[in-house]
Amino acid sequence: MLLSTSFLLAGHFGFNTNLLETNVLNLAVVLAIVLTYVGDALRGLLANRKQSILTNFREADQRATEAQNKLREAQLELEQAQAKAQKIREQANVTIEQEKKQFIRQTQEDIKRLGTLQQETLKFEQQKAQNELAEKLVKLALQQVREKLNQRLTSSIHSAVNNFQIVLFTNSKAS
C-alpha cells in the first residue's frame, strides 16, 4: 500500500481512504466467493461437457471401426463377386469352344452325309437311266420281233404259239 492514507479512529479502527485498493480487495473477495460457488457448477458443467465429448469420440471411433469392418466386408464380397464373374466368363469361354468344336464336327458330318447322299443319288439316277434305256431297248427288240413274227407268222404257226402259251399259262396257274 503505497499511497495509503488512513485515519485511525478510536485507536483500533481505521478508515481507508484509498478507494482503488479497497475496490481491488472487494473485487478479489467477490471473485473468490463467485469462483467458489460458481466454479463448482462450472467444473461440473466442464466435466459433463468433457464426458460428452469423450462419449462422442468413443461413439465416433466405434462407428469408424464399424465402417472399416463394413468396408472390408464389402471389399471381400466385391472380390468374391469378381472371382465368381471371372469363373463364369471362363466357363462360358470353355462352353463356347466346346459348342464351336461340336458345330464344326456336326457340319463336317453333315457335309460327309450330303456327299454320300449325293453319290447315292447319282448312282440311283444312273441306274434309273440304265433301266429306262434297257426297257426301251427291250421294247424296241420286242417290237422288232413282233414285226418280224407278224411278217413271217402263218396261221398254223400262230395257232401253235397260242396253244403253247395257253398250256404254259394253265401250268403256271396249276402250280
Curated annotation (Swiss-Prot):
Membrane topology per record: Single-pass membrane protein
Compartment annotation: Plastid, Chloroplast thylakoid membrane
Record's keyword annotation contains Cytoplasm: no
GO molecular function (one): ATP binding
Keywords linked to the UniProt accession: ATP synthesis, ATP-binding, CF(0), Chloroplast, Hydrogen ion transport, Ion transport, Membrane, Nucleotide-binding, Plastid, Thylakoid, Transmembrane, Transmembrane helix, Transport
Quaternary context: F-type ATPases have 2 components, F(1) - the catalytic core - and F(0) - the membrane proton channel. F(1) has five subunits: alpha(3), beta(3), gamma(1), delta(1), epsilon(1). F(0) has four main subunits: a(1), b(1), b'(1) and c(10-14). The alpha and beta chains form an alternating ring which encloses part of the gamma chain. F(1) is attached to F(0) by a central stalk formed by the gamma and epsilon chains, while a peripheral stalk is formed by the delta, b and b' chains.
Family under the similarity heading: Belongs to the ATPase B chain family.
Record protein name field: ATP synthase subunit b, chloroplastic
Species name: Chlorella vulgaris (Green alga)
Lineage, opening ranks: Eukaryota, Viridiplantae, Chlorophyta, core chlorophytes, Trebouxiophyceae
Primary gene name: atpF
